[in-house]
Regions:
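Long, solvent-exposed non-transmembrane regions
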Residues: 1-8, 41-43, 63-64, 299, ...
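Amphipathic alpha-helical segments
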Residues: 8-33
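Amphipathic, interaction-prone secondary-structure segments
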Residues: 24-78, 376-381, 388, 392, ...
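Intrinsically disordered, low-complexity regulatory segments enriched in Ser/Thr/Pro
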Residues: 52-113, 189-229, 233-238, 246, ...
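Intrinsically disordered, low-complexity regulatory regions enriched in serine/threonine/proline
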Residues: 77-294, 298-301, 306-308, 527-547
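Solvent-exposed adhesion/ligand-recognition segments of exported proteins
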Residues: 275-277, 281, 335, 346-347, ...
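Long C-terminal interaction/binding lobes of large macromolecular proteins
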Residues: 308-313, 317, 331, 337, ...
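C-terminal structured domain segments
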Residues: 448-522
């Protein structure tokens, strides 16, 4: 649970995008474009409906003619190339009119309990113009340029769970298709991808009706949906300890199951070898200009070279060969490569690990109540066990408590400031469990008692209620707590972002600073009409022949 390792996670079979597409394929969901009213300027609306066994969901998309000077990925932006809402059911004309008045202005508008998500996206202008012009000329886009960027639009927000009037998660959590985390958000992005590809082909036809061509299926799948994610996502790992425990616990259990296999079967060994080769190709096709990510990518490429060379001679039919391979990686690969290997080990074993998807939701209210009857001695032992790393730090040093998490007034978004450069302490959010654990431990030691009820202690020290709760949760849930200082001078918020995004299923992590990152989602994934094909769950790594296409 150290940030350096969490910030090296990759997508896996348990990622939420993978879960979504498996369900859509297995349950034979049907998709229909029920409206596509877009003019030659690319302005209008479209509706894409997904019909499941019991319910329908509809993406309502609004396309805009955005002046270049107004295009911004920042949270303070007020206009976008496209805006979206995921509607619970099938919207009628009155719903479309209501959404048309509210969705394009995003936070300035208001949606209703009929909506499950609210989103917006901007074009990657260089690639967008290239694709439109090539299709209008009757040609396919340049594959190298497509692979360099990876998407035609990137979302700058996908809001759910009650934001801006949308339905709370509790309203849909009991639906089978919504039980796993972030399923409506992932469905939103999946349908946005389809809309974007339809829109770019539409714009090419408007430019050259008699000459324009559509993207080939293989070229179409090369496009994902981009995303720009900043600090707003980072506190999630601290504020949802039970949920994070469920995610990490499922991943660790999946790895344990694979490592426990006594003798791998030849078909799964061959699939693993293929996945390893694809992962090597993926590493060499992944680019970033951020110094830290450049170093991590160099390590990953070297790791994938080492792994594939090792596999040329490794006996994967031997006793507990997967465990031996894991131990080999611990000694020879960087953390980045080790975590890629974890994802690769899960890949051939869907029959063994996919059921763990059902364990990745959490009722966080179940562990929220403070146990006031616990003794202060027991609480002290929990702090020693879980937060020993924090108790060993010198919290009087400026570097140890250099940062302050706070919420900006204008957008109500989390921000990270410098404690000794800005007057931010009055606005500090409780997002540093390590420091707060050390403060709690110091006050417990000052009382010199071990058998006093925690409730009595908290009557004298109410400022420790939140940390007492966290400690009691962490005592029950082994992966609930990051074991690192979240306000240290050299802490990298992008590690927190990548952790969550890897569970989404994101790829191509490309930090633009230590505080925000661009990613790609659903790249190489089948489109709705392709979900019945054999590769419906074999898309997260690019196909080996892709570079030659």
């Amino acid at each position: 649970m150290r940030l350096a390792r969490l910030g090296s996670f990759h997508q896996s079979r348990l990622s939420f995008m993978r879960q979504l597409l498996r369900r859509l394929a297995t349950e034979n969901w049907r998709f229909e474009t029920t409206a596509f009213d877009i003019d030659a300027r690319g302005v209008g609306h479209a509706v894409y409906t997904a019909q499941g066994p019991e319910r329908s969901y509809s993406l309502v998309a609004f396309a805009h003619d955005l002046p270049p000077e107004d295009r911004s990925d920042r949270v303070i932006a007020t206009a976008w190339d496209a805006t979206f809402a995921l509607f619970d059911g099938v919207p009628d004309d009155a719903d479309i009119d209501r959404l048309r008045a509210n969705v394009p202005v995003q936070e300035e508008g208001r949606v209703s309990e009929k909506e499950l998500t609210l989103s917006r996206a901007n074009r990657s202008v260089r690639l967008w113009d290239h694709v439109v012009s090539r299709l209008a000329a009757g040609e396919q886009p340049d594959p190298s340029l497509v692979d360099e960027v990876g998407y035609l639009m990137r979302t700058t927000a996908v809001y759910g769970s009650g934001k801006f009037g949308a339905a709370d998660r509790e309203a849909i959590a009991d639906r089978p298709e919504c039980h796993a985390p972030f399923q409506v958000e992932m469905l939103t992005v999946y349908l946005i991808r389809t809309f974007v590809m339809d829109l770019v082909e539409h714009m090419a036809r408007m430019q050259a009706p008699d000459r324009a061509v559509a993207l080939t299926p293989e070229m179409r799948r090369r496009f994902g949906i981009g995303n720009s994610t900043g600090l707003g996502m980072a506190p999630f790992l601290v504020t949802h300890p039970a949920l994070i425990n469920a995610w990490i616990g499922a991943r660790e259990e999946a790895l344990s199951r694979v490592r426990s296999i006594s003798h791998p079967t030849p078909d799964r060994v061959q699939l693993f070898r293929t996945c390893a080769a694809r992962a090597r190709q993926h590493a060499y096709g992944w680019h970033s200009e951020h110094p830290i990510q450049i170093e991590k990518l160099a390590n990953l490429r070297n790791d994938m070279d080492l792994l594939n060379t090792h596999l040329e001679t490794a006996d994967l039919s031997a006793d507990h060969a997967w465990n031996a391979l894991y131990l080999w990686a611990e000694d020879r690969l960087s953390v980045e490569g080790q975590e890629m290997l974890v994802s690769l080990l899960l890949e051939p074993h869907g029959h063994l690990v996919d059921d763990l998807s059902s364990c990745m939701a959490a009722d966080e209210t179940r562990v929220w109540q403070i146990n006031g009857q616990m003794t202060t001695g027991a609480l002290r032992e929990i702090l020693r066990d879980v937060y020993g790393w924090a108790l060993a730090l010198d919290w009087t040093q400026d570097n140890t408590q250099a940062r302050v998490w706070y919420v900006s007034e204008n957008k109500l978004e989390p921000r990270l400031g410098e404690r000794f450069e800005e007057p931010l302490e009055p606005y500090e959010q409780p997002l540093c469990p390590g420091r707060d654990a050390a403060r709690l431990f110091a006050d417990l030691n000052a009382d010199l008692t071990t058998d006093e009820p925690v409730g009595a202690f908290l009557l004298r020290h109410p400022e420790h209620r939140h940390m007492t709760r966290r400690a009691q949760i962490a005592a029950l849930l082994p992966y609930a707590e990051i074991r690192d200082n979240t306000i240290d001078a050299v802490m990298m918020p992008i590690d927190m972002l990548r952790t969550k995004l890897s569970f989404f299923g994101a790829s191509e992590f490309d930090p633009r600073s230590d505080r925000w990152v661009r990613i790609t989602m659903f790249q190489h994934a089948p489109f709705p009409h392709e979900l019945e094909d054999a590769f419906a769950d074999d898309w997260a790594l690019p196909p080996l022949n892709m570079a030659a296409e």
